[in-house]
């Protein structure tokens, strides 16, 4: 009797909650391993870049003794394992070292650049997610018709076009030919909201184009599956109005995978904007990494790249957690 009761409790809400905790814990552990491997790759990549750190700072004509002294001061002459251990320990504590170019803490530059990239990414996110969901749902409700085919073709075409190609086309059309929008995304610190949006419009559009196809396809697939589900047929047989069936039964289940995809893409929007930010002279994390690589500013480069890795990994972790927490069936199935 006691065995039966304990088994039923384990299979009840408490057991389900424990499975969710184990699932999330496993994902967190895998994310930490991923970040550790990324830190090793980033550190090794910085060490493999050509050029001497001291000479890159002091110049090619610097006295060799001054170069050696600077390398010793920066710790560049220590064993690689010692350098890595000290570097990753400081990074975890929020200390990314001093920039070789500006001789100021890297963390302040990375924090400011990340905030700018987040602004650009969130702006693109709040534009593309409603458009992608609306397009995908509308296509699913007209499956097989010309509207469905048109949305699918537009979404696929926008997805496969590289960001730098769409950025250049937008610059030529709206910045050079029509002169409707400024090419430079940089705006004065005291600029109003309209001026800010005007300067950010061109950098946002390539991101909207790229991610519209992903989100629209996921929304369409989820909606088609939900429309064919038994609970939807039951709701229709009960005589519920079409708009009630769509909003109460179809969308609630169809948008679960779309939400997780959108959360994952948000991480990329914030951290993967090197090309867009460079083309539009936007002071984000992508352009910071590009400029650091050109200047051989290793602390800035390593801090920026690892920060992007953290953002993307956390976004994936949040997406996985949302998918499990919002889907009761997957909550049990994925945890077992």
Description of each model-found segment:
Residues 2-20, 77-133:
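An internal, D/E-rich "acidic patch" concept
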Residues 54, 93, 166-167, 224:
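Alpha-helical transmembrane segments and their lipid-water interface positions
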Residues 45-46, 54, 58, 71, ...:
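Conserved protein kinase catalytic domain
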Residues 45-49, 57, 61-62, 91-92, ...:
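Hydrophobic aliphatic residues
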Residues 41-48, 78, 89, 153-184, ...:
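Membrane-water interface segments at the C-terminal ends of transmembrane alpha-helices
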Residues 18-22, 32, 38, 108, ...:
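Alpha-helical transmembrane segments of integral membrane proteins
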């Amino acid at each position: 009797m006691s065995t039966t009761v304990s088994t039923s409790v384990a299979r009840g809400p408490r057991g389900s909650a424990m499975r969710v905790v184990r699932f999330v814990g496993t994902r967190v552990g895998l994310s930490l391993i991923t970040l550790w491997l990324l830190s090793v790759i980033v550190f090794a990549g910085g060490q493999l870049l050509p050029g001497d750190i001291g000479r890159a700072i002091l110049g090619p004509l610097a006295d060799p003794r001054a170069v050696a002294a600077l390398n010793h001061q920066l710790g560049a002459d220590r064993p690689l394992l010692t350098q890595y251990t000290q570097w990753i320990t400081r990074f975890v504590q929020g200390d990314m070292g001093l920039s070789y170019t500006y001789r100021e803490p890297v963390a302040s530059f990375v924090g400011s650049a990340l905030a700018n990239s987040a602004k650009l990414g969130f702006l693109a996110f709040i534009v593309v997610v409603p458009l992608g969901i609306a397009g995908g749902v509308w296509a699913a409700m007209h499956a097989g018709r010309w509207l469905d085919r048109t949305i699918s073709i537009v979404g696929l075409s926008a997805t496969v076009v590289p960001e730098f190609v769409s950025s250049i086309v937008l610059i030529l059309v709206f910045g050079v030919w029509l002169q409707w929008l400024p090419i430079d995304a940089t705006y004065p610190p005291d600029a109003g909201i309209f001026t800010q949006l005007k300067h950010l419009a061109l950098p946002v559009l390539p991101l909207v184009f790229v991610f519209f196809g992903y989100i629209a396809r996921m929304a369409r697939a989820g909606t088609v599956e939900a429309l064919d589900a038994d609970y939807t047929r039951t709701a229709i047989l009960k005589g519920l109005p079409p708009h009630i069936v769509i909003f109460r039964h179809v969308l609630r289940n169809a948008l679960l995978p779309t939400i997780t995809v959108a959360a994952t893409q948000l991480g990329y929007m914030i951290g993967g904007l090197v090309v867009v930010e460079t083309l539009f002279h936007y002071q984000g994390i992508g352009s910071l990494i590009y400029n650091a690589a050109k200047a051989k500013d290793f602390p800035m480069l390593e801090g920026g790249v690892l920060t992007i890795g953290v953002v993307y990994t956390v976004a994936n972790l949040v997406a996985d957690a949302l998918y499990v927490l919002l889907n009761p069936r997957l909550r049990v199935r994925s945890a077992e």
